[in-house]
Amino acid sequence: MLPVTDSFPALAAVGGAQYSAVVAVAELAYRYRTPSAVRYEVGRSEVLLGTSGGGTEVGPELHPYFFTGFLAEPGPAAAGMLGCAAVARARYYTPASVIAAIVADPVVTSNGDRLRFESFSGCCGVHARLDLLPDALTGQPVRSGSTNVDFNEGMRAALGGAAVSGPLLLSVGADEVAVRTLGASVTERKVTLPGRWLKGFGEVQALARDMRLVAELVGAEAQRFIRGVPRNARRPLWAVPAGRGLALAVSSQPGAACLAGPHRLAELGPLLRFARGLRVYGPPVGALSLPVPSAWELDLGAARFTLTVSPEKYRGFSGEGALLGLLADAEAAADADLISVLLAWDPRIDAGRLSAEAGLPAGRVTAALGYLAASGRVGYDLAEEAFFHRELPFGAALETMHPRLVGARELMSAGSVTLAADGAGAVVRSGGVEHRVTFTQPHDTCTCPWWGKYRGTRGPCKHVLAARVAAGRANDARPGSVAAGSAGDVPGRAAARP
């Protein structure tokens, strides 16, 4: 059995994720000491969220207690929590061969001054996050960390009504006094999480880092656009800035955001009455771009609710390959170990501070943060344009779930890579065939059929990965090498975002 992550050494024994030897699936056991519930008191409602396992600022805990306080704006906060719960239970695309549903409980992270709720759909194509910002909370969280939270059926049914009945007190976990008062016993529920679901959680963070603000709509314009999006569109649509709003087109153009499977934005609907604006994010595209992921963020005043959707409704994030270059980079892995020691549950990670404290160039810090995203240890906040610290209890297995990465390492071990004398590429022998890799921008190219099919849109093929690793090692071995200070020598490494 594999350990959960270095940061969760005790979870395997206390109900965290257990992994099979081939790491095709993970069985996650949720053990809640106090199942979530809504209670009604005189003049107020109380939402008590049960917690199961997790890491905190003082180490792993069985049932972390993070926060008790009133919500400044109960309506949007409750609607956002219900939206996260809905995405966790949804499958927006169901292949004919799929019968069982994946229902993984949301994750909540306490970052010292805010709470973040995250969930991931069963089809691996939609990621949801609710950020309750400092102004949304009366008082600060008592502890920092991440944990799973129970969103059982009864609690979900009562939450909507509680939000409109007056002041709302939220508790994430319970202190010992509350536990004794409630007299609760541990309840357990197990869920099997496929490898593609686990990988997808990391892919979302890496893809978000490359997105930019495409458009910002305010008030009624935001509501009008979301309500007017056709839910049954069979092909990807493109949202194009037009005046103060957005128009939908059937083909890409510069400055547009892709929207494949518009029905996947359904969870924005119940929040529209609270929305002050809508921000749309996506990677740079051109006139002939293939479908790409996008993010749709509702401004709720003291909170934000964001849906990030994959490039196609039938295509989960786990196939994007955005993290493969970083996972193949031994230097990034070593730097990530150093950087992880310096993380302190920051709501906004200061890459400059990490660079100074770790003594690493900015490019290596950026690569290390990308590596930590792959292992579920940092997320990316589009509004803040920065990573934030959070720990997910299923990170250590992610690296072994990427067959292209495994294939690249096998090619390296077999001595199948011959670098070009001019450093512009390599010849990689695989399956009795020689494939030519060319190092170029924006994507390295390869003559293999897999690269010809996807042309870099799903990350590098195993031949490109092997060639880049070989080039990096050759550069490191060169006398007087300055590779340590270069962001361009390592696959998947991006320049630091301003």
Question: Which sequence ranges carry the predicted segments?
Answer:
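Long, low-complexity, compositionally biased intrinsically disordered regions
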Residues: 1-498
